[in-house]
């Protein structure tokens, strides 16, 4: 078990991601069309602005004002506020408000995959990335089957490792764009 992840330059945000399972899920939900650092600082901003990361409270609160407050939580505040609210509702209704039950109550790797896939905003890439973080940073044995062969956030164990991961990811995206244009 880790005491902090290294997805942001903010120690408080990193500690929150490691100690509050809903923060981790929210960070992954926000991780699209913004830098990793922005996405994973989002849960701390939400907690500071709303006062809690309680799933029931987030599911029943209009989060858009908190998302729009400067600096915005995400570049698409309305859409992502709704996504986080939907995610919190699933955690509240299906897991009794305990986000960690997504993985602690899973019967096997296939069940864990389904549980993650059923979360709002979680497609195949996020299933693998969250699986890698759960397996490599939180020692969740059932998540081993979800770990892809390529580097993911699960491999990030320091600020330098995050920088290297992002550099490789940018190079890979550029290579893919070049192939599409050829």
Positions of the model-derived regions?
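C-terminal accessory module of base-excision DNA glycosylases/AP lyases that mediates lesion recognition
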Residues: 1-15, 19, 107-118, 124-182
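Short, aromatic/basic-rich helix-turn unit that serves as a nucleic-acid recognition element
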Residues: 25-29
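Alpha-helical ds-nucleic-acid-binding substructure associated with the helix-hairpin-helix region
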Residues: 46-118
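Structural motif
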Residues: 12-23, 33-37, 74-79
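Alpha-helix N-cap and coil->helix boundary residues
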Residues: 38-41, 53, 58, 79, ...
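Short helix-capping/linker segments at secondary-structure and domain boundaries
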Residues: 32-41, 91-97, 138-142
């Amino acid at each position: 078990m880790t005491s902090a992840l290294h997805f942001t330059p903010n120690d408080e945000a990193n500690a929150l991601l490691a100690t509050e399972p809903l923060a981790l899920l929210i960070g992954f939900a926000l991780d699209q069309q913004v830098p990793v650092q922005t996405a994973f600082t989002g849960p701390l901003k939400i907690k500071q602005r709303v006062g809690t990361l309680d799933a029931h409270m987030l599911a029943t609160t209009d989060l858009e004002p908190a998302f729009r407050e400067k600096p915005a939580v995400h570049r698409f505040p309305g859409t992502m506020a709704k996504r986080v609210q939907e995610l919190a509702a699933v955690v509240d209704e299906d897991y009794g408000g305990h986000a960690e039950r997504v993985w602690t109550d899973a019967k096997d790797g296939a069940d864990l995959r389904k549980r993650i896939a059923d979360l709002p905003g979680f497609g195949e890439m996020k299933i693998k990335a969250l699986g890698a973080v759960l397996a490599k940073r939180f020692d969740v044995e059932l998540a081993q089957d979800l770990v892809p062969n390529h580097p993911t956030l699960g491999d990030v164990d320091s600020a330098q490792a995050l920088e290297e991961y992002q550099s490789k990811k940018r190079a890979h995206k550029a290579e893919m764009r070049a192939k599409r244009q050829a």
